[in-house]
Amino acid sequence: MSLDTNKAYFINQRDVVLRMQPLEKTSKNAANHLLLGDYLRYLGTTDGDWAKVKCRGDEGWLKTDWFSEQRLLEINFIDIGQGDGCHIVTPDDEVILIDAGEGEGFTGQGGDNMYRFITWRYNLRCRDDGKPPFDIEHAVMTHPDLDHYYGFINLFKHPKLNFKTISHNGIVERPLGGASQSSFLYDLGRKVPPTPRQKVYHLWDTVRTHQDMIEVLDAHPNSQKFYLSTLRAARDNNPQVQFKFVDQSQKFFAAYNQNNDLQMEVLGPITEDIEFNGQTKDCLIKLGNEGETKNGHSVIFKLRYGKLKVLLGGDLNAKSQDYIAQYYSGIQTKMSDLEDEIRDIREDLISQNLTIDERKAMEQRLDEHRKLLDLIISKTRGVFQADIAKACHHGASDVLDSFLQAINPIATVISSGDEESHSHPRPDALGAFGKASRGHRPLIFSTELARSSVEFSYPIKFYQKLKDMEAKKDAATTQAKKDEIQQDMEQLRDSNVAKYGMITIRTDGERVIIAQKLEEERSPGQKWDIYDLFWNDKLQEYEYRKGKGH
């Protein structure tokens, strides 16, 4: 391979050790531990089949057949504190952010971890002011819950970032004003009253187009609602940004369609054509209260790259899972009703004194319910089955076991937060995820659990380092030196977000690794805990095989 200092290169091995010297040995020669897909720069020097490179901030040596020009798919689940946050880099080097956590939150005291991660990842603090802003192709706000969208507000305001499109589920909270007494009005917009046949409300004011969004923002220029404030920040600081409504009728997200190596199917939210007052609109059903409706209509993506399938599904709840399964299976019986009836029949069979005929009839009814539930699961699985899935609603317990069975993943990633009142991930949900997964040893990752084991040891070192830097700053004799140390402190805080809690997926469409940082690195060449998914040709699906050290 002819190397060029102006080209981008990427690790093509599962993992490799960056050497300090061009030698095979790693003992006392390890500079860093690199993963499949890590970006590197060639520094212009070779020594036999070794090349000097810079990767993950360190200079060192790698064999030239350990890297290539092929960029992989990278999916990072960020430890953003409370909420969800996913960072994707496509094989075409486009950046997609799906949710960003709660950022600074209601109090303004939150960690704003997605902001810090993006600042660290793209070195924004050191980016030349004369350079054009760094492009983020897509920001996706899966639904208007603070712990999913408010982390975007400071990113939207960042002068060194440019957001091209912002996608959403069409639900925009707005002030009620003087219309709050009318049942026809709702702070998610107007709702269509049910007809005798429908028996359900639909949201009439779903924001469907860019112009719809601009009109809503213009109608409420001074609203203090956090969602509107976040959207205004996007518009005011990114003049060319386009707001895009996402629903299942589009089939694919943006240009990631069947003509692209990376495909992103849109499975939700689901709209229905509703006629009201002589107009017909594609509307979202009112699933329950406002929270259930907002969460249940989360944007759902199914990513396909090569052989790998990844499901990303916002904050789906039991009511929405029933509705989704009805839509995709074509069977109107609810999963939740069947689950309840099966449980009740089983209890009756155990606890009641039944005649032979009564028992036979009850067992027959149980068999019929099980067969129908299995059919719904099978039909839904045809659409939703994935190899890796982001858990719905941070590992909350408001999920259907049967819907989890329809997803049937090998690995589940739970993005969970710090608020003890939520207690996410819930123990019963963890058990349900494992039980509904495929394989003998299904994998469950949690951004919080990945961090919690080091939160009492690592921070002591981290804060001591900050304290030492603060002392140096106080002792500095010039403002320039003080500013330099302050920037170093901010960069340290930014990089800390990526060190612990993040779960990363790397794949070329055939090989797949899922990795997280070790609690305590064993050496500079052993920093990552890595899990491999292997393609089984006979089964035509991925499987996990336990490796060394697991």
What are these regions (language model features)?
Residues 20-36:
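SH3/SH3-like (including bacterial SH3b) beta-barrel domains
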Residues 84, 104-105, 144-150, 172-176, ...:
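Active-site environment of divalent metal-dependent phosphoester hydrolases
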Residues 376-380, 386-458:
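Internal alpha/beta domain cores that form substrate/cofactor-binding pockets in large enzymes
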Residues 2-7, 32-48, 52-58, 66-72, ...:
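Flexible, acidic/histidine-containing loops and adjacent segments that form or flank the divalent-metal
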Residues 18-21, 84-88, 97-98, 104-108, ...:
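Short, solvent-exposed loop/turn elements at domain surfaces
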Residues 70-94, 100-102:
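An acidic-aromatic substrate-binding cleft motif
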